[in-house]
């Protein structure tokens, strides 16, 4: 606790890290960050997995950036490109900004308004909930090519994020086992004056 009875930032970070991240032992006597931290591929992969794919919440954008129906904004969660969109029902959804077919980037603009998201590569089309709605040449051309007979569009939507709205700040997580945003932030939520809007 710091002056005023609240929790200080350092205390919050210690609690958050101890609750949500694996222990990393620091060598005794080391007072500088080793250069290896910035160039080690294995460490970078671990960081991506723990900080961005693990049970953590990451800031995505402001709700004010997508005020209208069909508005979208693009950002990244770690190295993963994501889309945050307001669907026709007014709900806010988040999903990976890569086509499930061949991994091509879907939205190349940082912001916009659209009713659907189309892949420029093979024209697979998604709605603003991340559902696959159309596959061009699903049956092939003149009996050649196409998708297998048992192909179901409903099973090939974009990878989604859980979304939390705290006073217009939109956070997302890929992890289904992540705690609620309130549990994740703990006492820091009150210290920041954040309440849950959705």
Segments the model singles out, each with a brief description of its role:
Residues 4-5:
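Glycine-biased, low-complexity coil/linker segments
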Residues 13-91, 125-198:
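Rieske [2Fe-2S] iron-sulfur-binding subdomain
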Residues 71-120:
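Glycine-rich active-site/cofactor-binding loop and its immediate structural neighborhood
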């Amino acid at each position: 606790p710091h002056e005023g009875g609240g929790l200080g930032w350092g205390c919050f970070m210690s609690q958050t890290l101890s609750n949500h991240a694996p222990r990393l032992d620091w060598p005794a006597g080391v007072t500088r960050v080793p250069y290896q931290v910035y160039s080690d591929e294995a460490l970078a992969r671990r960081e991506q997995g723990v900080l961005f794919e693990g049970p953590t919440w990451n800031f995505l954008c402001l709700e004010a950036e997508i005020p209208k129906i069909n508005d979208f904004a693009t950002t990244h969660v770690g190295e993963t490109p994501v889309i945050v969109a307001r669907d026709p029902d007014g709900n806010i959804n988040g999903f990976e900004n890569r086509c499930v077919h061949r991994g091509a980037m879907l939205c190349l603009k940082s912001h916009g308004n659209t009713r659907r998201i189309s892949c420029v590569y093979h024209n697979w089309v998604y709605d603003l909930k991340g559902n696959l709605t159309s596959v061009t040449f699903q049956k092939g051309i003149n009996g050649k090519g196409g998708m297998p007979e048992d192909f179901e569009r409903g099973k090939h939507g974009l990878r989604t994020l859980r979304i939390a709205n705290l006073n217009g700040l939109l956070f997302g997580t890929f992890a289904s086992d992540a705690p609620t945003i309130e549990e994740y932030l703990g006492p820091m939520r009150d210290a920041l004056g954040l309440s849950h809007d959705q």
